[in-house]
Structure formats: structure tokens, C-alpha cells
Amino acid sequence: MEEDIDTRKINSSFLRDHSYATEADIISTVEFNSTGELLATGDKGGRVVIFQREQENKNQPHRRGEYNVYSTFQSHEPEFDYLKSLEIEEKINKIRWLPQQNAAYFLLSTNDKTVKLWKVSERDKRPEGYNLKDEDGRIRDPCTITSLRVPVLRPMDLMVEATPRRVFSNAHTYHINSISVNSDYETYMSADDLRINLWNLEITNRSFNIVDIKPTNMEELTEVITAAEFHPHNCNTFVYSSSKGTIRLCDMRSSALCDRHSKLFEEPEDPSNRSFFSEIISSISDVKFNHSGRYIMTRDYLTVKVWDLNMENRPIETYQVHDYLRSKLCSLYENDCIFDKFECVWNGSDSVIMTGSYNNFFRMFDRNTKRDVTLEASRENSKPRAILKPRKVCVGGKRRKDEISVDSLDFSKKILHTAWHPSENIIAVAATNNLYIFQDKVN
């Protein structure tokens, strides 16, 4: 980034508002497409909302970074598994875009059990002048047809349609936590707590199990899969993380079932920091390759770590996200916040890392300058095109006017899901049921 991260002026824009929010309105995933022109969000009500970026306007250059609603559709419905007497939530766990091949857009969305491939396309013309149908679509009496008509296309108001093209189901016993599109653009993988499956985008009735960590005796279970992602360039390589804080790199060329990893990334635990909560806070909630595929970023409860693929024994960078919460782990355990799963993202050049925290705070770390900043996504501070001010958390002692005490943080306001535009300094931040777009200020 051209300027120091803590001195940059950041514009904000407030997109999605539900004054009377219900559980179904809570945003559960955020994802830009490969060009950054579209931004998709999924929520706990099973809906997908797609936003489209404003086109360039010389008269209003500041509107270029704004996103407006492009399409809204119901992706998943609540279901009931009668064999196991379990409700299957409609909540969208993940959205992943496929690279654009033509005028239409394609995306994968998943809830706990079922992945769907959606086609989002535009229509601004409609056919008229059928021989066997009238203009309302009713079948005409063949006896009344006296002339042959050539159907024509007439202009109509632009309509955006979302249609399900594939439904990939019945392959996961446990809850799906990740989907990742392969760099061959023909396959993708879906991961649940104990297994990872490989799918062909054209075939819905068959998948290949590539990782299975389920023990013969479930009482021997010591860890679960928490996230998985394909390498951005090598279609045979992928990583998955676990609740024990380990990351495994697997190569599908070595064997069809990748139960034996090629590399294991794990940081030795510091005995002086050992506590009752050590195993819980070391669980990895997100794993991401950088754009070159040389580095992996992981997020656990208190830190973000960057790993070099060539060095397995420790991360090359560790960033403290909210270390001031270390003294609060007991109360965070009691209110279940310690199990929150925060995501992390790279910027387009891999020089800055972003991840969320509590009190609607989100953190940015500049890898080059080692500077970091805490910003807040809230309606009070984020009027459209307002400049965000850095926030600081005070742990103890005297508190300055611009600081907030760690004891007054609101743990019900949390930023779990964030996304970064693939090439520009535009970010999307989901704060419970509200979506914020922030961008570098254009002078």
C-alpha cells in the first residue's frame, strides 16, 4: 500500500440495514468475485444478496466505489433429516465465485449439507411472435392460424435471474465448513468436520473422498477439520487446518486418499503460556493461501500467523489481534465467545492482512512496515464517505479520551466475515446484520 496503514484515510459506505434484525438477517459469509465488480453475501436465512459496483461517472467520481443491490435469491431452505431426527439449517456457510467465462456469472453456495451451483444472468430482451402461442403464453387453436410468423426479440426492462444449475448433496455426514474451487476450474472440494470430498462441477451424483480423519472408534477422536483450501496455481495441492492448531499440506498425486500429509505446519507450544484454554484458542478458524501460493495465513482465536511453505516448524510472522483478551478467557469461555470463528483475508498485493475482532472492530496489519491499525464498523462512526479514525483499546490504568476500556467491549458485536477487493483497496466488512464497504479516500 502506498501510505502507512495507520495514517490512511478510509472512506466508508453503509450498505445493508435491518433496524429490526432477526436471526435470519445475520450475515454469515462475504465474497468478492475475481474482478471485484460483484460482491456476494449470504445470511442465516439462506439468502444470497449480490451487489454490483457503480460504473464510472465523470460527474460523480466518488460513486465509483459504491455497490448497489444487483440480485437477491433464496439459495437454501430449512430441511429435516428424518433418519437422524436433525434439523438442517438454511444458513449459508460459504460462497465461492467461479471465474467468469461468458456474460453470466456462476457461484457455489453451501449450507451444512448441500452445495449448489448458481447461474446469475441478465435478460433485457424477450421473444415475441410465436406461431403456436399467443402473447400471454396460451396455446393457440391450430385452426385459427392462417399465417406463418417469424419470432422476434423485443427490448424489455433489465431483469437479473438466478437459477440453480447443479445441486451437490448426500455426501457429507457432518457440517460443511469450507468449499474451495480448484485452479483447473473443473473441480472443487467441500470439507466437513471429518472428511474432505472432491467434486467435478459437472457431476452431482458422485464425489471422491480425499481426506478422512474419522477414527474407527469415535471416542478416540482428538481433532476435527476446521477449514480447507486449494493452492491457487497447483491443482493437485491443498491445505486443511485442524482444531489442534495444525495445518496439513496434501498432494493428490501421491495417493488418492490424502490421509498422509506431505507437510505438517505446527508451532511448538510455549510451556509458560499453557492453560486450560490453550487447546481451544489454538484451534484454527480460517486458512488462506496468498495469491502467489508461497505462503499460508491462518487465524486462531488471538492471532494471525503467516507460514512459509518451505518452513514447517514455526510461522514466519505472528500478529496479535486482540491479546488484551487473554485475561478475559474465562468469561469468554462462559459466554461461548471463545468458540467464535474469525476469518482473515489478504489484500490484492499480499502486503496487508485484515481480520475481525469484537466491538465491531477490525484489524489491519501491514507486513512491510509492521504497522497495525484498529478500525470500527458502526453506524455512529460510518456515515457515507466519512473518514474512519483509528481506535485503541486500553487494558488497565489511566484511559485516554480516545481509548476504549477492555471491560466495556461489546462481545455481541463481532466481525467474523471480511473480504478484500482482488486489486483495489476496497474492503467489505460484515457486522452482524449490516454490511459495510470501506475504501481508500480519493482526493
Swiss-Prot record:
Entry's family note: Belongs to the phosphatase 2A regulatory subunit B family.
Subunit structure: PP2A consists of a common heterodimeric core enzyme, composed of a 36 kDa catalytic subunit (subunit C) and a 65 kDa constant regulatory subunit (PR65 or subunit A), that associates with a variety of regulatory subunits.
Keywords from the named record: Cytoplasm, Cytoskeleton, Membrane, Repeat, WD repeat
Major site of localization recorded for this protein: cytoplasm
Ranges of the WD repeats in the UniProt entry: 22-61, 87-128, 171-209, 220-260, 279-317, 334-375, 410-443
InterPro entries, per the entry: PP2A_PR55 (IPR000009), PP2A_PR55_CS (IPR018067), WD40/YVTN_repeat-like_dom_sf (IPR015943), WD40_repeat_dom_sf (IPR036322), WD40_rpt (IPR001680)
GO cellular component term, pick one: protein phosphatase type 2A complex
Name recorded for this polypeptide: Serine/threonine-protein phosphatase 2A 55 kDa regulatory subunit B beta isoform
Intracellular or extracellular location(s): Cytoplasm; Cytoplasm, Cytoskeleton; Membrane
Listed PROSITE patterns: PR55_1 (PS01024), PR55_2 (PS01025), WD_REPEATS_1 (PS00678)
Function: The B regulatory subunit might modulate substrate selectivity and catalytic activity, and might also direct the localization of the catalytic enzyme to a particular subcellular compartment. Negatively controls the initiation of oocyte maturation.
GO molecular function (one): protein phosphatase regulator activity
